[in-house]
């Protein structure tokens, strides 16, 4: 994933409406624009613009079925971000937090 791709994903995820769209697609992938509008109580134009940003970030894929355009969540960019920025640091931080928790809780027991 290039820096431009990563920046596009983070910019897309920064907007709460786009995160709600992704949540809606995660719960029920393959929705039409109309279905997404009903779930979010937004105009078609607003939802369409947000879907465009999500598509630019490769977070949403579309497939035409007849006259309908179905929108699907593409979790790959989010997984790549997880692998790059979260997974490799996760274990070390969890071990440190667990040690801190034991130390703090041990200190509380001694003072009680």
Task: Label the predicted regions.
Residues 40, 51, 75, 90, ...:
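Short amphipathic alpha-helical/adjacent loop interface patches that line ligand
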Residues 4-43, 68-80, 84:
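N-terminal helix-turn-helix DNA-binding core of bacterial DNA-binding proteins
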Residues 11, 23, 55, 61, ...:
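A cross-family signal for key residues in well-ordered alpha-helices
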Residues 55-66, 72:
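Beta-hairpin "wing" of winged helix-turn-helix
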Residues 1-5, 26-27, 79-112:
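Amphipathic alpha-helical dimerization/coiled-coil segments
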Residues 38, 49, 55-56:
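Alpha-helical residues within the helix-turn-helix
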Residues 46:
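Conserved H-loop
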